[in-house]
Amino acid sequence: MDIRKRISIVLVALLALVGVSAQAQTVSGTLIDGQHKQPLGYAVVQLLGSDSTYVSGTTSDDTGRFALAAPRDGRYILKVSFVGMRTICHDVVVAGGKDKEVGALTLQADEHVLREVTIAAQAPKVVLKNDTFQYNASAYRVAEGSTVEALVKVLPGAEIGDDGSIKINGKEVKKILVDGKEFMTGDTKTAMKNLPASIIDKVKAYDQQSDLARVTGIDDGEEQTVLDFGMKQGMNKGFFTNINLSMGNHGRYSERGMAAYFKNNFRMMGFLSANNVGDMMFGGGRRGGFGQTRQGLNNTKMAGINMNYDNGKTWQWDGSLRWNHNNGDLQAKVFSDNFLASQHAYTRRISQQYTRSNSWDGRFRLEWTPDSMWNVMFRPSLQLSKSDGLDVSTSATFSEDPYAQGDDPLGDDLLAAMQAQGTLVNRQRNTTVTYGDNTSAQASLQVNRKLSANGRNVTLRFQGNYNDADAKTFSTQDLQYYQLLDAMGQDSIYRAYRYNLMPTKSHGMGVEATYSEPIARRTYLQLAYQYNYALSKSDRSTYDFFSLGGGYFDGVEPAYRSWDSYLALLQQPLGSYFDQSLSRYSEYKTHTQNIQLMIRMNQEKWRFNAGVQLQPQYSIYQQDYLGVHVDTVRNSFDWSPTIDFRYKFSPQSNLRLFYRGSATQPTMSQLLDITDNTDPQNVSVGNPGLRPAFTHRIHMFYNGYRQRYTQSWMTFFHFASVHNAIGNSVTYDASSGACVVRPVNINGNWNLNAGVMFNTSIDTLGVWNVNTFTTVDLNRYASLLQQSRQSLVERNITNQTNLSERLTLSYRNSWLEVALDGSVEYNHTKNQLQSAQNLNTWRFAYGGSINLTAPWGTSLSTDLHMNSRRGYNDASLNSNELLWNAQVAQSFLRGKPLTISLQLYDILHQQSNLSRVVNAMGRTDTEYNSINSYALLTISYRFNLFGGKPQHPAGVRRGDDGPMMGPPGGRPPMGPPGGRPPMGPPGGRPPMGHPGGRPF
């Protein structure tokens, strides 16, 4: 089946969406919060017969609107109720087969009900409005003391990667907001792991417009996906704090504190945290899935402050400052199957890596709007960081699968056996000690002037950046070849002992002018010109100690910044070991111009943007390396067309189609005709004949929502194809296991990613809910492979197919939540040249969770899931892991501000951590050490002070840090305390200890 047929099948499947059926007669209206004069969402609305028998029911949407079906003409009673407010009944007459609009109905606060009401209806899990997905936090139970990361993990369509990256409905989240205000800009991870879930009422996911589009009012299509956490009503007044202190067995601990202060137009939030559970406590996995792969043991500390001010007229500013410290202990067991023509190449590597880092990050945004025609925005930022690293690894390369001989490929017995068989290619041991010190600063200034009220604008933007980095590296490499003999007929040995000093400096500046001209009703022509200048200098000094002989530094114990321990053994002054050939000086200057012409049409129902960007570039590159002096000038020209179309079927249903083409120029190092053999196992060769690559990207996104049963659905489709992709031609030497890599242009690379999400409540009160999320990933990688310099070049194609499905059925009321869930992930890898190595792997997960909450403040949560893997080379990885977590919590004092909880993670000691990566060159499976089974005893305390008086509300919601809500009369939280511990918990052994060295 060719690519076009595959794409057609996927498109047809994605676009076969559920139709929306219309009601013949409806009773509709709008609900208003009497105290706050705002729309009242998620209230229970029931239509009763004249004898008070139930006819139909629903809940109001985010705008307070509701609509119910009236089966026939007659008299009805409209009953509206909401927790904390007085229930109202309204007589309704439906006649003549016509819809009935009852207008605005106002509900008033009821203090008595607020204290004693039992919630009958449940807030809808997700509501769609325009292009915004709004998740109601009260509909998702998370464990006591959880941060918003645990909440996001259980949202439909959400994915959190191993590196902490967040995806919502297939799009990566770039920024976190709180109540629409910027929060810890530039670091989504800090916000996710420190913002308490207990203060959150709603989570919105949407595409935020660029600064330029927001101030000009003209959509430029340059959005970034954001998560906007809305705080509970009443929480944005006065002062509140949350403190969580946890101690556990095996030396585990996790401490976290948060305080917030609000006064008039000013808000300030501060955070402190320290833990050695890998930042993975309180929400390790997601329902029906495997969760994140935990990589190593990490001790982290963080302190941060975030401030916002908005006087509502002319001034706004946001500022954040954070400090992060990390100590890492990562052990990785790696097995690689390299796709090297008809020749097999397997590599087994075990590495132990220690890291530590300190970093400071400060950011600020100032916006001044003196009148309706002017807008000025200034964004400065500063980052400081220091880091240390220590890496010790042992590896071996084989021409046959070592697991066919035994379970320990790096064991002495198996290595000796494979050497005797002639299938052991090489064996090496590496030690690397690194240090880095980096300072960087950026600033941008944007000035916009509206020339008229109909969209005529002129904008000027200035930006600059500066970076100063200093790095040191000491490395030893001992490599023995078993199929490559030296002059004496013995196994050949290669050694490299080197010390590198690498200072790097760079700076840049840019200026941009944009002009928008209305040419018709809601139609604009936009012209932009940008000039950027960048300069980067690097001067690496390399000292080579090869002449000292093998094993010269064996007596040195590697440690952080242990340069003196190595250098003290030198027989001559350090300068006498300087190697001019291996040292490298480079200087790179670029002058880039961007010229953009766009037409933008912003109609009521649809928006259309189309345009082209032209990018001429002039570059000057100088380099001294490997005895070759380079001084070259290069001119290039790129272009990028864009088409963006959006159609709004209704406020809850939208379609977006997007296309962009973009060119990518090869780097200077790829173009230089230089052979770099400083690493004999990975030799790189330049290619002066490289042409630029051109990537075509097509995106489709559609969402819909139906108020009855609170049904929402979403589908997305992303496709990218690269013409003249810059790939690699690899020549493999079977006798040494070395690769010579040369960049080449190659066609045939593409990827497709698509998904469908559907969420619905089965009943009108939202007690029963079903969610399904299906994804398809197709990838095609092309490369060129050669057995030797004399053999023919073979074209290799690797196709990868990944299918996944997650399904969840849940029941919830005010004191109980039960969920059954499951997922399946299928991965098929097919290699053109090594069909015998094609693999089909499966990952299954299924189980359930139960959360019970007693009215006296006790909550009990447990979940049990079976995780299974099949199809891996290493039989030990084809396992069944039964993961059981449990938590019990008790809240105390008036308003339940004090909570004591016990969490048990991976009670059965079966959690493991494995990741797989497939690309054009091969397939790699990696198993990491991790924090597995442990227990934590946690004490949480919450203090609220609103309007100068401590608040201890009696209304409760869900199991976060205990009950929390705003002052009487506001919308109270919906749901009880309680929650579940993470499904895929951390676990593992205590830290192995970090090497010594000077402190920061």
Each predicted region: which residue ranges?
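Structural motif
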Residues: 30-40
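Short, acidic, small-residue-rich periplasmic hinge/interaction motif at the N-terminus
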Residues: 32, 46-48, 81-85, 95, ...
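A short, solvent-exposed loop/turn motif at the edges and junctions
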Residues: 48-54, 75-90
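Short, acidic Ser/Thr/Gly-rich low-complexity loop/linker segments typical of extracellular
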Residues: 50-65
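Short, surface-exposed beta-strand/beta-hairpin micro-motifs centered on an aromatic residue
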Residues: 61-70, 165, 191
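Periplasmic plug
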Residues: 128, 165-213, 226-231, 266
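Short, polar/charged loop or turn motifs at beta-strand boundaries
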Residues: 132-154, 167-168, 178-183, 244-249, ...
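Primarily recognizes Gram-negative and organellar outer-membrane beta-barrels
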Residues: 186, 209-251, 265-1000
